[in-house]
Structure formats: structure tokens, C-alpha cells
From Swiss-Prot:
Predominant subcellular localization, coarse grouping: cytoplasm
Cofactor(s) this protein requires: FAD
Subcellular location, record wording: Cytoplasm
Function: NAD-binding protein involved in the addition of a carboxymethylaminomethyl (cmnm) group at the wobble position (U34) of certain tRNAs, forming tRNA-cmnm(5)s(2)U34.
UniProt keyword tRNA processing, yes or no: yes
Keyword tRNA processing: yes
Species this protein is from: Salmonella paratyphi A (strain AKU_12601)
Gene for this chain: mnmG
Record protein name field: tRNA uridine 5-carboxymethylaminomethyl modification enzyme MnmG
PROSITE patterns cross-referenced by the UniProt entry: GIDA_1, GIDA_2
Length: 629
């Protein structure tokens, strides 16, 4: 039977991608349905209890700048906040927070349940309704049919999921949840390329059985950072420390002696695991010269006794897991409350997607999260927001949107996936972005909030705060430009006390701030340049914009040159065998990837600059050379 009311957008799956997709579509005014197998696990942190980190924190800030949920949720649930790379330049600084799993899940569910235009329904989805290569709805396990103009798949590791502990395995979407086998079979019937990936999680430890007195503590930062541009530290719950222990030779011997019982090394697992979050088995074998590995003992929440031992993800048998855990300092009497495991699951080749995350083959069908080959809550959330907003725009018959690589880490993420694909779980790093000086955490709102407002994602409160911040930045920069001090002035001595080279000529506040030894706080503590801005976010922007002005201008020039290639479009139906002068390898790769632009084509491995030149000449001769607006 059909549900009585049609929807504009259906989201299938209630993890980090699904919740952002649902919130985005509903915020844009579209009637949105979120289908989940269990309402109680909306926003569940299936693996590590943390948000952010290098590259990942940048994505969270971008999601927030577009009006998303993740940053707000972690500000309400974070029990330890830190700035990573705090001593380095602003481009690579990143925020990370330990999370209370229960508080995080509660924050997400509360936001969803209070979002207008959004209905949540608990039923597993077993089928899609596809008519003439166009998705028009979904079917649940009890045969209930829902119609919609667009469908977003955010099903995580549930598609034909298989859990491995030692040489034993069983079907599961994650521990305690069933897999989605009928939907997996249905998707395999569609013209989509599918493969298998693997991820894993460590055993959870009873905190009452750990001797923390012999372990080093790791505390959060003070003052505490915040994730959301709309947040403040007063929202944070009680803060707690993490602890550090290490593996040792005994640990490594236990692992080496039991590799024949590892499903990975016994050939039972075929899926490829994450390169940058390897299992402890992989670490011991790949880094055989290391006699120890650092392990972070992270609390799972303020009301939980469970500890997440970050660094010992494993699928070895339970008895071996016990030996591994008890071989480490402070853990000699530790008890495991949940075993570690590996999980294999289906993912679909993201090269079959447009940069909007819509399928190239099924109109109105969008993919986001681990189904696209990524790993991590943050990568999933960013994709979910993009897929949700584009599903909403499709249902409203509006032009879709995707950020450029020069505009956002989300743009880098989507371009990497859709252009290059992935053979292993993809994780975001700052090193993946060629314009990372422009793509900082601190300016995510300056880069994206205006676009978010145009798209209908940003509410009035955020928009007003954003404009207030812009005005504060502009006003303060003008004040510093127009405030001067001369070497003969009475205030010169106070200024010189902060300089390595005394003033030799008249200088403005901006001139002084450009000096590496002068901070904004120091400058505005001087009588001649006081007072400091009360708006701390605006003050941070003033300092960064002034100090890095020359570098930023050079990078902007590079971006403008690159945009000429990005905006040179390639026909979707072009058969590259027609282009004389291209090698067979280049022809095969271009026909396989079907790049949307010269810029995308240039990033395909094996497509040389010479091949790009040949292609540009051919397009011009054929009268097919055109650029997007």
C-alpha cells in the first residue's frame, strides 16, 4: 500500500549523513521523510566517541557555516575540547572534541524532532521504486510504499554487512543491528558499480578495571574551543581527561603469534580497510620496527563506565583481544565489555555520481556517506548536507549546487570521490587541498554562509550574526589602518617594547600587526591602539587577514587561473576516441571517468598536461569549447 501523503525528499538511514541530509532538505522548505530502522539510534556514534581532527574539523565547520547540525550537537555533547596543531599556522589548526555518546545522540534527535517539514518513520527499507531510470519512492519491510521526487541513500555499513570476530562471522549492519540485505540486492540490480570495503572498531573496556594512577593524563584546552560559529563554551557539559598507555613487545608477540586466527590475514575478509585508521594487527605488521604504539583511553560519556581504547581496532578472536588489552600498562586486570570487530559492507563507485552526489544513471537518486567509500562521521555529515540540499533543489526544480575545490574541503572531498573514485575508505586531510591557506577552519563561515543563505539553509539568526561579524571585521581593519604612531610620539616607547626592531618611520596599526612578533592582543593592549574587539571571532579574522594578506593574495591568483580550467566544460556524451592525438590509456580513462570539466580531467591519474592541451585544441576546432558562468 502507498502512504497517503507524497513527500518531496526521502532520506534512507539515520546516521551522520542521513541526519544532515534530512535537516538540510527540511530547512529548505521541502516535505522530508527520514526512514530509519531504529529511531533510538539516530545520530549514533558507531565507532570512536569524537568529532573533528585534522581535515575533519574543517568539514564540521563548513557544515556549520551552511546551517548544519554536527557542530551544534558536539558543542552540547563534548566532554573534552582541544585545538590540534595549535602552534602551527591557521591553515592546519583543527578542533577536536571527545563526545558523550548519549548526549550527542540526544542533541541530534532533539534537533530532528523539532525541525519543521520533517517526518521520522521507523521501518527498514527493502526496495526502491524506479520508473524509467527515475527514482520515485521507497518500499519498507512491511510493504509500505512512500512516494517522493528525490531519494537520498545514507545507509552506512548496513548494505550486506558482515561482522567478523576471529574466524567467525555473521550478518550485521553494526554490532546489535541487522544488515540491509534486500536493499543491497536491489541496488545491485541497478546500473551501478559496487565493491566491498572494510572497517573496524576496538573492544570497549570497563573503566573500573583500569589502573589510571599509572597512566599519563591528557586534558582539554583552557579556554575551551567551540565548534559552531553560533556556539559558546557555556554550552559544554562537564569536561574530563583522557589517558595514555602504549602497546609493547608482549602485545606485539601476542598479535604475531595469532595472525592465523585473524580474518584479514587468513583471507576471510576481502574488503579493503582504511589506510589511516589501521587495525592493531596491521600496525604491528606494517611497522615492524616500532616497539610500541600510543593508545588513547577515551571515556565514552559522563554516565558510562565504558572506555574506548583508540588505537587497537581489531578483528582477532575474543581470547586474543583479552591478551592484547591486558598486556598494556594500567590494563593488567582490565575487562572487556564489548568485543572489537571488523565489518565488511557494500559501497558504490562514486565516479558514477555527479558532483551534486546525484547518480548519473538514476534521476533523483543521491548517495552520501560510507556508501560512497568514505570513512568518518565528518565526511559523512558533509556529504549528507550536500546530497540533502541538492535533493531539495531537485524536488523544487531548481539548479543544483556543488562547491569548488577552492571554496571548501567539501568541494575537495566530492571532487576527489567523483573524479578519482576510491579503492579504500577515504579520509579527509588538509594535505588533500591545494588551497588550504584559503580553506581554514576559522573562515568557513566567510566562505560559505552567504551561499548557504542563497540556498535557503541559513536562518535569520545565523545570518544576522554573520553580517555583524563582517561589519566588525571591516570596521576594525579600517580603524587599524587609520591609526598611526610615529617614532617621536610619546606612545612609541610602549610600542617599541613589543618589537624586535624599533620604529624608524610612521606605522599604522596594520603595519605593526604584520610584524611576526606582534599579536592582535598585544597591539590592542597598547594605549594608542586600544580597545580590542569584544567579538573574538572577528578579532581572530582581523589578525589572520592582516598577517597573511600577501600569501592569501598569491593563492587567490592561483585559484583564478585554475578556475579557467574548472569552468571549461566537457560534453557528458563525448566519446574520447574521436579526439585524435590522445593515447589509448588517456582515451580509456576519460571514457571511464566522464569528467565534467577540463579541471576534473586534469586530476585523473595518467591524464597528462599534453593530453589536456590536445583536448582543448580539439574542442576549439569542433566549436565545443564553452565555459560555465
Amino acid at each position: 500500500m502507498f502512504y497517503q501523503d507524497p513527500f518531496d525528499v526521502i532520506i534512507i538511514g539515520g546516521g551522520h549523513a542521513g541526519t544532515e541530509a534530512a535537516m538540510a532538505a527540511a530547512r529548505m522548505g521541502q516535505q522530508t521523510l527520514l526512514l530509519t530502522h531504529n529511531i533510538d539510534t539516530l545520530g549514533q556514534m558507531s565507532c570512536n566517541p569524537a568529532i573533528g581532527g585534522i581535515g575533519k574539523g574543517h568539514l564540521v565547520k563548513e557544515v556549520d557555516a551552511l546551517g548544519g547540525l554536527m557542530a551544534k550537537a558536539i558543542d552540547q555533547a563534548g566532554i573534552q575540547f582541544r585545538i590540534l596543531n595549535a602552534s602551527k599556522g591557521p591553515a592546519v589548526r583543527a578542533t577536536r572534541a571527545q563526545a558523550d555518546r548519549v548526549l550527542y545522540r540526544q542533541a541530534v534527535r532533539t534537533a530532528l524532532e523539532n525541525q519543521p517539514n520533517l517526518m521520522i518513520f521507523q521501518q527498514a527499507v527493502e526496495d526502491l521504486i524506479v520508473e524509467n531510470d527515475r527514482v520515485v519512492g521507497a518500499v519498507t519491510q512491511m510493504g509500505l510504499k512512500f512516494r517522493a521526487k528525490a531519494v537520498v541513500l545514507t545507509v552506512g555499513t548496513f548494505l550486506d554487512g558482515k561482522i567478523h570476530i576471529g574466524l567467525d562471522n555473521y550478518s550485521g549492519g553494526r554490532a546489535g543491528d541487522p544488515p540491509s540485505i534486500p536493499l543491497s540486492r536491489r541496488l545491485r540490480e541497478l546500473p551501478l558499480r559496487v565493491s566491498r570495503l572494510k572497517t573496524g572498531t576496538p573492544p570497549r573496556i570497563d573503566a573500573r578495571t583500569i589502573d589510571f594512577s599509572v597512566l599519563a593524563q591528557q586534558h582539554g584546552d583552557n579556554p575551551m574551543p567551540v565548534f559552531s560559529f553560533m556556539g559558546n563554551a557555556s554550552q559544554h557539559p562537564q569536561q574530563v581527561p583522557c589517558y595514555i598507555t602504549h602497546t609493547n613487545e608482549k602485545t606485539h608477540d601476542v598479535i604475531r603469534n595469532n595472525l592465523d586466527r585473524s580474518p584479514m590475514y587468513a583471507g576471510v575478509i576481502e574488503g579493503i580497510g582504511p589506510r589511516y585508521c589501521p587495525s592493531i594487527e596491521d600496525k604491528v605488521m606494517r611497522f615492524a620496527d616500532r616497539n610500541q604504539h600510543q593508545i588513547f583511553l577515551e571515556p565514552e560519556g559522563l554516565t558510562s563506565n565504558e572506555i574506548y581504547p583508540n588505537g587497537i581496532s581489531t578483528s582477532l578472536p575474543f581470547d586474543v583481544q583479552m591478551q592484547i588489552v591486558r598486556s598494556m600498562q594500567g590494563m593488567e586486570n582490565a575487562k572487556i565489555v564489548r568485543p572489537g570487530y571488523a565489518i565488511e559492507y557494500d559501497f558504490f563507485d562514486p565516479r558514477d555520481l555527479k558532483p551534486t552526489l546525484e547518480s548519473k544513471f538514476i534521476h533523483g537518486l543521491f548517495f552520501a556517506g560510507q556508501i560512497n567509500g568514505t570513512t568518518g562521521y565528518e565526511e559523512a555529515a558533509a556529504q549528507g548536507l550536500l546530497a540533502g540540499l541538492n535533493a531539495a533543489r531537485l524536488s523544487a526544480d531548481k539548479e543544483r549546487w556543488a562547491p569548488a575545490r577552492s571554496q571548501a574541503y567539501l568541494g575537495v572531498l566530492v571532487d576527489d570521490l567523483c573524479t578519482l573514485g576510491t579503492k579504500e575508505p577515504y579520509r579527509m586531510f588538509t594535505s588533500r587541498a591545494e588551497y588550504r591557506l584559503m580553506l581554514r577552519e576559522d573562515n568557513a563561515d566567510l566562505r560559505l554562509t552567504e551561499m548557504g543563505r542563497e540556498l535557503g539553509l541559513v536562518d535569520d539568526e545565523r545570518w544576522a550574526r554573520f553580517n555583524e561579524k563582517l561589519e566588525n571585521i571591516e570596521r576594525e581593519r579600517q580603524r587599524l589602518k587609520s591609526t598611526w604612531v610615529t617614532p617621536s610620539a610619546e606612545s612609541a616607547d610602549e610600542v617599541n617594547a613589543h618589537l624586535t626592531t624599533p620604529l624608524s618611520r610612521e606605522a599604522s596599526g596594520e603595519d605593526l600587526l604584520r610584524r611576526p612578533e606582534m599579536t592582535y592582543a598585544q597591539l590592542t593592549s597598547l594605549a594608542a591602539f586600544a580597545p580590542a574587539l569584544e567579538d573574538e571571532q572577528a578579532a581572530e579574522q582581523v589578525e589572520i587577514q592582516v598577517k597573511y594578506e600577501g600569501y592569501i593574495a598569491r593563492q587567490q591568483d592561483e585559484i583564478e587561473k585554475q578556475l579557467r580550467n574548472e569552468n571549461t566544460l566537457l560534453p557528458a556524451t563525448l566519446d574520447y576516441r574521436q579526439v585524435s592525438g590522445l593515447s589509448n590509456e588517456v582515451i580509456a580513462k576519460l571514457n571511464d571517468h566522464k569528467p565534467a570539466s577540463i579541471g576534473q580531467a586534469s586530476r585523473i591519474s595518467g591524464v597528462t598536461p599534453a593530453a589536456i592541451s590536445i583536448l582543448l585544441v580539439w574542442l576549439k576546432k569542433q566549436g565545443m569549447l564553452r565555459r560555465s558562468a
